[in-house]
């Protein structure tokens, strides 16, 4: 099965322990991109006779890509590098969907491909659960360097974020449920693996997981009564949910006191900053509702909104897929995309039977999580969702769509697959240069070691958003800066909400005859980063008055 390479590398991506700035998920996501490109080539090479049609989502994704690239042309400060990233993710999503369709066609149904998907999720969740146990017991040294060291009492496997692990574990538990219901797994090992994964899920202390667990039980209740497995599935889901809630309470109220796990109480009961963040983003969206701020420009919208709604937490995503879409492509197009996608899912859910119901259940935790964070921004979730949607698409088509003759379709698909593979390789190569230069720049800023005299900053042709950041990190705020240097600082500060960049930009404005804009930038720091960080920035700014008297003209708050 050509899709084997895709799923093997997805599994690898979940387990890679490296997380380096500035793109901390790159080494986990890269295997997913490469696996998809390889699997596409294998699927096209192995195809005989007819090929699957293009996915139902192709037209919608084409509109979104036009929106992303149109923003580069029409919207100020939008960067082509962001559009390239959007392209590799959205095009990958559509191609993964097609791969799911083609695999189901080759296998004459979704049973065998779905079994492979379930096995991969069960394996990934189980291995991640074992890693979580090492993190919980502070025994990471035993597995170094094959495990990420936890810096809190919340475990996260090798995904570097507890809620990410929680979503993977829930998807793995759905897969285990299917394997047990179909007798592919005997009762004893199924119970053991479910217990292991459930305890690891408790250790994540994820409120998102609690919501997803309730949503899964609700989905089981909503399954049509005509489905033969409905009663058994409802009983299984109810028993598991009860066990999960009991274990969560036990960990919070009993083990939390025994082991002094203060983080447990905080993680499950502390108020979230999301509502405040959403208010900021809605205030920013109100300033540009028709066209949005451009793709991946959530930080820009937050900066606009923060001047009206001060907050404490900075973000590059809205922690809500719906709000992100509205910010990126505007309210009209965003609502249209959401309505079309929701309508398609509802129609297909009504047609779902047997394994397609389990496919929906597998994707539900990812959907719930996407309304509270941004797992959709990670290729190891987005591309897997595309493949599973391809399986759903194959089984639930009300009228089977005619396949495309291979002789006519294969050249175009080969071009698409080759172009995608080339884009993946080009972006991967450039990002590795970014990662190395980012490391060097951080050392330079901290005055650690010395950069070789012959070192040359990489020329980035695709990922220019990182090129701007690397340039900005090397600039020093001083009098006599050129307009181009100030423009670099401005672009970097608007794209990324990093405190050091914002302060450097504010200081540069004050030193170069723009006191009003410098004062505005200091107000933004106060509104975006909160009183403690602003107090440090203000003290640093005032400490330079003796050296630079022109800063006295800046009326900082």
Predicted regions and their residues:
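Transmembrane alpha-helices of multi-pass inner-membrane enzymes
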Residues: 34-36, 217, 355-409
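Alpha-helical transmembrane segments of multi-pass inner-membrane proteins
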Residues: 4-19, 32-44, 69-72, 86-99, ...
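Transmembrane signal-anchor hairpin modules in multi-pass inner-membrane enzymes, especially those
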Residues: 1-74, 78-115, 119, 179-188, ...
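Short aromatic-rich membrane-water interface segments that cap or initiate transmembrane helices
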Residues: 20-22, 76-88, 150-165, 270-278, ...
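A membrane-periplasm/extracellular boundary helix in multi-pass inner-membrane enzymes
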Residues: 203-204, 209, 224-269, 282-283, ...
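TM-adjacent membrane-interface loops and short helices in multi-pass inner/ER membrane proteins
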Residues: 161, 275-315, 322, 329-333
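Membrane-interface catalytic loops of GT-C/OST-like multi-pass glycosylation enzymes that act
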Residues: 23-28, 81-82, 159-163, 205-209, ...
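Helix-to-loop transition at the C-terminal end of transmembrane segments
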Residues: 19-24, 131-144, 251-265, 290
